[in-house]
Structure formats: C-alpha cells, structure tokens
C-alpha cells in the first residue's frame, strides 16, 4: 500500500479505509460466487464510498505537495474563503 500521497495525519485513516475496502472486495467476490446479488450491490456501494473517501484524502495530500512546490518557486499563496450568502 503506497501512502505517499496522503498527509501524515491522514495516513492511519487512509490505511483503515483501504483495508476495509480490500475486505469488502473479498466479500463481494464471495457474494457474486454465491449468487447473492442484493448483498453484492450493497457491498459494491460500500466499496464505492470508501474509495471516494480515499481519493479525497489523496487529493488533499497532492494539493498540499503542489502548494509547497509553488511556494518554493517563489509564488505567494494565501487561503481565500468565500461567503455563501
């Protein structure tokens, strides 16, 4: 499991989600083999949610790395929040 794209604080969370997705994929394979398609649909949905969360965590890490590289090149970055009104 490659955790290079995650922030240090997110690594344990990402590992836990990846392990859960792997376990669910084994269960999904078994459900398909047994012909339990309702269970397979449920498991596939859970895997989708977990992988979306993992992707968001990885994107957050890549964004941080990109911001650091930009700052090293002399680009001044600030956080801008917008009002939702």
From Swiss-Prot:
The keyword Plastid does not apply. The keyword Glycoprotein does not apply. Keywords: DNA replication, DNA replication inhibitor. It comes from the Bacteria. Transmembrane segments: none annotated. InterPro entries: YqaH-like. Changing residue 48 to E: Loss of interaction with DnaA but not Spo0A. It holds the Pfam family YqaH. Part of the prophage-like skin element which is not expressed during exponential growth. The element can be excised during sporulation, leading to possible expression of this protein. Interacts with domain IV of DnaA and with Spo0A. Binds to and counteracts DnaA replication initiation activity; overexpression decreases the number of replication initiation events. Also antagonizes DnaA's transcriptional regulation activity. Ectopic expression during exponential phase stops cell growth 2 hours after induction, leading to filamentation, aberrant chromosome segregation and septoid-trapped nucleoids. Overexpression during sporulation onset leads to dramatic reductions in spore formation. This is Small protein YqaH.
């Amino acid at each position: 499991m490659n955790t290079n794209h995650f922030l240090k604080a997110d690594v344990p969370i990402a590992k836990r989600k990846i392990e859960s997705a792997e376990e669910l994929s084994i269960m999904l394979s078994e459900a398909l083999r047994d012909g339990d398609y309702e269970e397979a649909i449920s498991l596939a949905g859970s895997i989708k949610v977990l992988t979306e969360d993992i992707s968001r965590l990885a994107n957050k890490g890549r964004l941080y790395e990109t911001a650091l590289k930009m700052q090293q090149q002399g680009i001044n970055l600030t956080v801008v929040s917008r009002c939702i009104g």
